């Protein structure tokens, strides 16, 4: 009887332990991004740096080329730190697609009342792709790509 109980407990532990190692929740990735966006809207870029891998790559409409690594990205972002204010951030239709230790988050973003250094308030509309990788048990951004939604193109 004792052997049967031990085997039963070992089986239950094996099943529950194997289940918990791959307990992926897409909303956890979305929550990481929302938290970073909320801090960014208060002028604090550290929310993004906290969830980025050290070797992250980055594009946005104002970069001349890809930015490689968090140190280079911090230098690029430094002039904006503390100067950006956004009244309301709306993340539209976030979608997380995952394969193994990689997850891709895509969404549209609307920044209402976006203001740079006390200048005029605007509404900014973005497309975003964030590639997350599970590193040492935590999801980190390894690549960011931001573009304007329906940008005005010169002929």
Indicate residue ranges for each PLM-predicted region.
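Bacterial N-terminal signal peptides
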Residues: 5-14
């Amino acid at each position: 009887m004792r052997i049967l109980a031990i085997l039963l407990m070992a089986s239950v532990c094996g099943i529950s332990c194997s289940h918990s190692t791959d307990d992926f929740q897409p909303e956890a990735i979305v929550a990481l991004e929302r938290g970073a966006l909320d801090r960014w809207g208060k002028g604090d870029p550290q929310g993004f740096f906290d969830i980025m891998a050290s070797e992250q790559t980055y594009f946005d409409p104002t970069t001349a080329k890809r930015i490689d690594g968090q140190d280079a990205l911090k230098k690029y972002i430094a002039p904006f730190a503390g100067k950006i204010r956004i009244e309301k951030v709306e993340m539209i239709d976030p979608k997380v697609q995952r394969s193994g230790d990689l997850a891709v988050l895509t969404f549209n973003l609307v920044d209402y009342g976006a203001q740079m250094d006390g200048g005029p308030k605007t509404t900014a509309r973005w497309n975003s792709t964030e590639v997350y990788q599970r590193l040492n048990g935590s999801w980190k951004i390894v690549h960011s790509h931001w573009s304007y939604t329906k940008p005005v193109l010169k002929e």
